Design a protein with these regions (language model features):
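Conserved Rossmann-fold NAD(P)-dependent oxidoreductase catalytic core, especially the SDR/UDP-sugar
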Residues: 3, 89-134
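N-terminal Rossmann NAD(P)H-binding glycine-rich loop of SDR-like oxidoreductase domains
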Residues: 4-27
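SDR active-site strand-loop-helix element
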Residues: 10, 35, 60-66, 103-109
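Adenosine-cofactor binding site in Rossmann-like domains, unifying the SAM/SAH pocket
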Residues: 25-50
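NAD(P)H-binding glycine-rich loop region in Rossmannoid oxidoreductase-like domains
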Residues: 45-85, 97
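Conserved mid-core alpha-helix of short-chain dehydrogenase/reductase
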Residues: 47, 86, 90-94, 147
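Short alpha-helix in the Rossmann-fold core of NAD(P)-dependent oxidoreductases
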Residues: 80-88, 99, 104, 140-141
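Active-site Tyr-X1-5-Lys
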Residues: 132-158
Length: 158
């Protein structure tokens, strides 16, 4: 990436997104774009489309997600799968529509089987059951991963 490339970090105030943001700044990238949830609701497809139309990012880091702890995962199962699928569909779809040079989609350790050996290896993905309490979130993340893979295979995106 060029140091002045337009880079959008979705979720730049979260745990992972803020680390990505800081790392990019430390490496001298000068054209970083970030929006808080109040400034841009990633669940709103029209707002996401408008943002991409206006900002025209060249690179996208998708670190935004609807997250919670064990209790929230148990109570709000529908919200976890629905909201994460919606965020991913909006950001990945607009990244494709705007021909971004590269999209980095972040998964989660919870996409791996519940009983995966440590350290986890990519080959064990989808080989056995997920942890039940994380299942809706994990399935949404797996769907995002497969969505990116499918765009790459069908359209040659990166």
């Amino acid at each position: 990436m060029e140091k002045n490339a337009k880079i959008y970090v979705a979720g730049h105030h979260g745990l992972v997104g803020s680390a990505i943001w800081k790392n990019l700044q430390d490496k001298g990238y000068t054209n970083l774009i970030g929006r808080t949830h109040q400034e841009l609701d990633l669940l709103d497809g029209v707002a996401v489309r408008r943002f991409f139309d206006e900002e025209q990012p060249e690179y996208v880091f998708l670190a935004a997600a609807f997250v919670g702890g064990i209790m929230a995962n148990s109570i709000y199962r529908a919200d976890f799968i629905y909201k994460n699928l919606q965020i991913q569909q909006n950001v990945i779809g607009e990244s494709f529509r705007h021909n971004v040079r590269k999209l980095l989609f972040l998964g989660s350790t919870c996409i791996y089987p519940r009983d995966a050996e440590q350290p986890m290896k990519e080959e064990v993905l989808l080989t056995s059951p997920l942890e039940y309490t994380n299942e809706p979130y994990a399935i949404a993340k797996i769907a995002g991963l497969k969505m990116c893979e499918s765009f790459n295979l069908q359209y040659g995106t990166n």
